[in-house]
A protein has these predicted regions:
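Transmembrane alpha-helical segments of multi-pass small-molecule transport proteins
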Residues: 41-45, 114-115, 142-173, 187-196, ...
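Membrane-interface "cap" regions at the ends of multi-pass membrane proteins
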Residues: 1-66, 216-229, 248-253, 445-448
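Hydrophobic, membrane-embedded alpha-helices of multi-pass small-molecule transporters
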Residues: 35-52, 199-204, 214-278, 301-322, ...
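C-terminal membrane-solvent junction of multi-pass transporters and transport-like membrane proteins
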Residues: 378-448
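Membrane-water interface regions at transmembrane-helix termini and the short interhelical loops
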Residues: 59-62, 87-88, 104, 112, ...
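Selective recognition of specific alpha-helical transmembrane segments in multi-pass small-molecule
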Residues: 48-51, 74-82, 117-128, 188-200, ...
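Membrane-interface loop-to-helix entry segments
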Residues: 158-200, 260-264, 365-378, 429-437
């Protein structure tokens, strides 16, 4: 038994290189994935509870039509552009983010952005674990009336831990495991989502009733259109930044662009609209307050329909949970030189522990992510598209410096700029653009 554990823990670069997930080098053509399963995986990843939360927040801040439809589209479009730019680098180089950071931040310097993003994405995993626990706690304990009662409930603790174990087991099988759960889940997620939209509109008394409810709800709101767009951008800009983890598997360029399109323009936009409906129709519901959607509306349609809704929500969180856990696993495996399976268990345990207490700070955590992560990718974008893309295709890190001061100067400038962002632009975009500009200047100046 001890010998098996030693072998499991042991780093075998050749075995990792030849695995389906290959965290240590650029993928070979044989390691790229078929289009259908990869796009299904993207849809499952995009079905993240953030969309419901974001939509619910907007539903309580601006009119549903046409404001919410337009602002959510524009915000998702901005994230899609970033995701497509970054994701295309992943496709062309076949490299995960950890490898891309080595080319730009240096062989040693890359440890800082990789470990930083990994810690934050493990925290993101904790958010999804907590959401699963909340879903089942509210479903099994309809009498709960206070938020504190949710997190102290034994039902929450047990179901959150089970969710963490479930996500870890699926991710243990790598991208193949993610595809297997995503493919059958897509149809269920779409059907449940569409039915929930239909029921919300019926609950409001039709579309005209919905618009009347929306107008009355936001009559005293001070939220502006720009603020609404910024909320949407902040909710998924981090997902756009880590896009190479999945686009590297694409066999064709259009697939690399389709992945962020499906995640952001289709899945997230769909969820934001559903969440906005929930925010308008059920603004006083504990379900809506904690998950962005009131599953009680489905429960009122009968036990079968209600539990289909609960299971659909659970599937959405499952496909999101394992796809999120995969991100820090690949990044840490590539930089720490530990087997992917080992990092899956470690990251899964950490995410599960965080899931028991982090969900209460969802919006604070989201703001932290959206401010600190985007500037990290700015130097990668500039280096690839404007300075020296050839080195990304060399397949070797020989000759790469241990540290690249230009990248760290650019990141610090970008991160600081998020706190001084003008009101008309999202801090995340300010940070990203600042890091790109400063990196280009520093790279041209310091390398003369």
């Amino acid at each position: 038994m001890i010998e098996k554990l030693k072998n499991w823990w042991k780093w075998d670069p050749e075995a990792e290189k030849n695995s389906a997930d290959n965290p240590v080098t650029a993928l070979t053509d044989n390691q790229r994935r078929n289009t259908g399963p990869l796009l299904a995986l993207a849809f499952g990843w995009g079905f993240l509870v953030t969309g419901l939360f974001t939509g619910s927040q907007l539903g309580n801040g601006i009119p549903f039509w046409p404001d919410i439809i337009v602002t959510t589209f524009l915000g998702n479009l901005a994230n899609f552009i970033v995701g497509a730019i970054v994701g295309y680098i992943g496709y062309k180089t076949a490299c995960n983010s950890g490898l891309l950071y080595r080319y730009v931040y240096g062989n040693v310097g890359a440890y800082i952005p990789v470990l930083f993003i990994s810690i934050l994405t493990i925290g993101w995993q904790g958010i999804v674990v907590g959401a699963f626990g909340i879903t089942w706690t509210l479903a099994l304990n309809p009498g709960i009336e206070a938020v504190d009662d949710i997190f102290s409930s034994s039902t929450f603790i047990i179901t959150a831990i089970l969710a963490g174990i479930l996500y870890t087991i699926t991710t243990y099988f790598g991208v193949k495991g993610l595809e297997r759960i995503s493919i059958p889940s897509v149809a269920v997620l779409v059907l449940v989502g569409l039915y929930a939209i239909y029921l919300n509109i019926i609950q409001a008394g039709g579309f005209s009733g919905l618009l009347s409810l929306s107008s009355a709800l936001v009559a005293e709101s001070q939220m502006t259109t720009v603020e609404a767009i910024n909320i949407v951008i902040g909710s998924w800009i981090v997902g756009a930044v880590v896009m190479p983890e999945y686009t590297r598997f694409a066999k064709k360029g259009w697939v690399a662009i389709a992945i962020p399109f499906i995640v952001l323009i289709i899945a997230q936009w769909f969820l934001q609209i559903l969440g906005a409906l929930g925010g308008v129709v059920s603004s006083d519901s504990l379900f809506s307050a904690q998950l962005g959607i009131d599953l009680n509306i489905l429960m009122q349609q009968g036990m079968i329909i209600g539990w289909i809704g609960i299971i659909g929500m659970s599937l959405a969180l499952w496909t999101t949970g394992d796809a999120n856990l995969y991100l820090p696993v690949i990044q840490t495996s590539s930089i720490l030189k530990k087997p992917k399976n080992v990092m899956t268990v470690i990251c899964g345990i950490l995410g599960t522990i965080l899931g028991l207490g982090l969900y209460q700070y969802f919006f604070e955590f989201l703001n932290l992510l959206s401010s600190l992560v985007p500037p990290l990718i700015g130097p990668v974008i500039v280096e690839y598209y404007l300075i020296n893309k050839e080195k990304f295709h060399s397949g070797s890190f020989d000759g790469i410096a241990s540290w690249n001061p230009s990248a760290f100067i650019a990141y610090i400038a970008g991160a600081v700029s998020t706190y001084y962002s003008p009101a008309f632009i999202m801090p995340a975009i300010t940070g990203l653009l600042t890091s790109m500009i400063i990196y280009w200047i520093a790279r041209k100046t310091l390398t003369r």
